Amino acid sequence: MAQTLVVKIGTSSLAGGKEGNLALATIAQLVEVLCHCQRRGDRVVLVSSGAVGVGAMRLGLTERPQQLAQKQAVAAVGQGHLMRMYDDLFAVLRQPIAQILVTRQNFVDRQSYLNIYNTFQALFELGVIPIVNENDTVAVDELKFGDNDTLSALVASLVEADWLFLLTDVDRLYSADPRIDKTAVPIERVVSLAELAQTIQVGSAGSPWGTGGMATKIRAAEIATEAGVRTVITDGRSPTNLLKILGGEALGTHFEPRPKTINARKRWIARALIPKGELWLDEGAVKAITVGGKSLLAAGITRVEGEFQAQDAVKLCDPTGAEIARGLVNYNSEEIRRVQGQQSTELANILGYAGADTIVHRDNLVVTL
């Protein structure tokens, strides 16, 4: 049965060592694996890092640039060379590819988000393998994915993938970094991310040439599994592992997808949008939303954090400040401060106009517990 596969390869797997040289043998093997999957009927997306690393190599830089403008310039140099390499390798196997460069703003804007979806579908119909990367040259700090693990998870959610493979420089997730801690225990299967968080130690940074560590991969797994995508962390230096895993072998760390998934629009609200503020709720409102599936009313709001406009995304928090949901607000932050704790029947009198009865309607609300 044909499946949709999203494969993310990081800079640590693309590079052959600390000097940042490309691991061409590994990349060529990955290309062969992806072409094999494509030819048997699977739909394949490759999310590839490496523009900054390749650009730095071409420019003779010995360290990854730190300033945004310099990173963007180096990425502009590297992205073309990266795609040329992929095009040369895929062309040997007569497999057409496409470059898709996106920014976080493309995922935040609903129309742009849908346009990206339609582009993927058209490429799949044409038998093309899309190669995705963040458009580093035009991205701004406030609207960056930050790492391609997150980008790959959002892409997997967007195209409703069956599998997300996060290729890294270790064979699976461990209780601690096995390169440092010899007592680290391998983790083969994850059902509860909450339980996992209590048992492992993860770093916030990856290799010198990458931006993502294991923590970002776990966050990516959360996004993907919430969308019903089985996620696997495995060794990027052995691309044939993908075929073995698809064949049923127990390699890597498998994150089980959630059995009940939300619809595509709510996935967009929950994970693609960037919350502009927070609404703190009383216990009654928390229960009504998480158990009863109700809309958020003004009466249940105890605190408003941040400045935002109507239809912006916000976090909904319990009395301790822990996030319980996300949603699109019907009023701006100033208006909500004026009506918080009030009955819905009083909103028009307080605001001076008749608006929505709800602060966040349940159709625009997603529980994230």
UniProtKB/Swiss-Prot annotation:
<dbReference type="InterPro" id="IPR001048">
    <property type="entry name" value="Asp/Glu/Uridylate_kinase"/>
</dbReference>
<keyword id="KW-0067">ATP-binding</keyword>
<feature type="binding site">
    <location>
        <begin position="211"/>
        <end position="217"/>
    </location>
    <ligand>
        <name>ATP</name>
    </ligand>
</feature>
<keyword id="KW-0547">Nucleotide-binding</keyword>
<feature type="binding site">
    <location>
        <position position="49"/>
    </location>
    <ligand>
        <name>substrate</name>
    </ligand>
</feature>
<dbReference type="Pfam" id="PF00696">
    <property type="entry name" value="AA_kinase"/>
</dbReference>
<dbReference type="GO" id="GO:0003723">
    <property type="term" value="F:RNA binding"/>
</dbReference>
<dbReference type="InterPro" id="IPR002478">
    <property type="entry name" value="PUA"/>
</dbReference>
<protein>
    <recommendedName>
        <fullName>Glutamate 5-kinase</fullName>
        <ecNumber>2.7.2.11</ecNumber>
    </recommendedName>
</protein>
<dbReference type="Pfam" id="PF01472">
    <property type="entry name" value="PUA"/>
</dbReference>
<dbReference type="InterPro" id="IPR036393">
    <property type="entry name" value="AceGlu_kinase-like_sf"/>
</dbReference>
<keyword id="KW-0963">Cytoplasm</keyword>
<dbReference type="GO" id="GO:0005829">
    <property type="term" value="C:cytosol"/>
</dbReference>
<dbReference type="InterPro" id="IPR005715">
    <property type="entry name" value="Glu_5kinase/COase_Synthase"/>
</dbReference>
<dbReference type="InterPro" id="IPR015947">
    <property type="entry name" value="PUA-like_sf"/>
</dbReference>
<comment type="similarity">
    <text>Belongs to the glutamate 5-kinase family.</text>
</comment>
<dbReference type="GO" id="GO:0055129">
    <property type="term" value="P:L-proline biosynthetic process"/>
</dbReference>
<dbReference type="InterPro" id="IPR041739">
    <property type="entry name" value="G5K_ProB"/>
</dbReference>
<dbReference type="InterPro" id="IPR011529">
    <property type="entry name" value="Glu_5kinase"/>
</dbReference>
<feature type="binding site">
    <location>
        <begin position="168"/>
        <end position="169"/>
    </location>
    <ligand>
        <name>ATP</name>
    </ligand>
</feature>
<feature type="binding site">
    <location>
        <position position="8"/>
    </location>
    <ligand>
        <name>ATP</name>
    </ligand>
</feature>
<feature type="binding site">
    <location>
        <position position="136"/>
    </location>
    <ligand>
        <name>substrate</name>
    </ligand>
</feature>
<comment type="function">
    <text>Catalyzes the transfer of a phosphate group to glutamate to form L-glutamate 5-phosphate.</text>
</comment>
<feature type="domain" description="PUA">
    <location>
        <begin position="276"/>
        <end position="354"/>
    </location>
</feature>
<comment type="pathway">
    <text>Amino-acid biosynthesis; L-proline biosynthesis; L-glutamate 5-semialdehyde from L-glutamate: step 1/2.</text>
</comment>
<dbReference type="InterPro" id="IPR001057">
    <property type="entry name" value="Glu/AcGlu_kinase"/>
</dbReference>
<dbReference type="GO" id="GO:0005524">
    <property type="term" value="F:ATP binding"/>
</dbReference>
<dbReference type="InterPro" id="IPR036974">
    <property type="entry name" value="PUA_sf"/>
</dbReference>
<keyword id="KW-0641">Proline biosynthesis</keyword>
<keyword id="KW-0418">Kinase</keyword>
<dbReference type="InterPro" id="IPR019797">
    <property type="entry name" value="Glutamate_5-kinase_CS"/>
</dbReference>
<dbReference type="GO" id="GO:0004349">
    <property type="term" value="F:glutamate 5-kinase activity"/>
</dbReference>
<keyword id="KW-0028">Amino-acid biosynthesis</keyword>
<keyword id="KW-0808">Transferase</keyword>
<feature type="binding site">
    <location>
        <position position="148"/>
    </location>
    <ligand>
        <name>substrate</name>
    </ligand>
</feature>
